């Protein structure tokens, strides 16, 4: 493969026409087999060319903001990067809570991850030089001691911007315990904080039990007696750290949840059993509610046990006969009805016994209903047959429908009505003729009697 470099080398001819005029050209081409050009200024792919791909070592953790002295000039590049915007511009009036004053007032040695993008081209030489110095200072015996604290480091003033000479000594200690000495700013400062307004915080030890404060507050402790006191909520106890100068801030969501759950368990009262009894005419109904004193927020194993018991004094029967009285008839109203029936009917035994038998023997009532229904069907069928035969007879008596066997019932009734009117008119006419004939008969009888007398 052949190497094609950029502006660091003199202009060379690139065999790839597509990449010849590119601003940044690749160093290798996969379609060429030679290792390097045969030009006079070409460099074989050894250690020199691999330095272009050298990755800078991982930058150390952010230096502590507690190593501040009464100096106006930063000692090294780390102090410059740790200074806030107001300190870099030299404005003492504009103080931010993220500056040395704000952080100093919260904790003596806060270790906050500021920025891990320190591998820029402008800071490359400074980073290499600083790393070598830090490693040299780390091997010295005096550098292993604890970091010193300045009494006035927590005060929000422009005088507290510098760093002491022990800043380099504290860095290896921080590198030795990266997990316990560094926290994410997003965890500590969840909400935007306004300037010059201290936030109420809670202090928690590095390895203390999970009794932390609610998530969202900056957790720290005063650096010196001269620093401003930070208000802590009642009911929260501060414990000294187990060891070391730095304190790990505990702001886990699980710790806050367990703290709130424990407080609720301490405050809540035990509820044994609540029993509510309601008396009805049909029978007593008892509701039993059992509440467990455990809190339900910890999981399914601590859920409240609730029991609902419903008792009825009147048994429920399967009702098939919809015409029969309901089994839920009040027992108090039943005796007056029996008395009324006894007063009205002379033989009340049957009327009293049958409803009782129906209500307490559903099988017997079902059999009686089936017999009654069967008898009703037989009678209905017989009635229909009689009606059909009557229409057939009526049709046979009407002269117009004698030969019409498929005549409808309406036609049969209509023709029969007309025929009845015709017969009535015919009868009236015949009666008139009968009367005339009877009168003529009387006259003829009188004439015969007169003839016999002469």
Curated annotation (Swiss-Prot):
Subcellular location: Nucleus
Ranges of residues in domain bHLH: 371-423
Keyword DNA-binding: yes
Keyword Cell division: no
Pfam families documented for this protein: HLH (PF00010), Myc_N (PF01056)
Domain of life assignment: Eukaryota
GO CC annotation terms, alphabetical: nucleus
Residue ranges with Low complexity bias: 151-161
Comp. bias regions, Basic and acidic residues: 363-374
Known partners and oligomeric status: Efficient DNA binding requires dimerization with another bHLH protein.
Involvement in disorder: N-MYC2 proto-oncogene protein is overexpressed in liver tumors. N-MYC2 is totally silent in normal liver and is probably a retroposon. WHV virus activates N-MYC2 by integration.
Protein name per Swiss-Prot or TrEMBL: N-myc 2 proto-oncogene protein
Annotated source species: Marmota monax
Organism phylogeny: Eukaryota, Metazoa, Chordata, Craniata, Vertebrata
Gene: N-MYC2
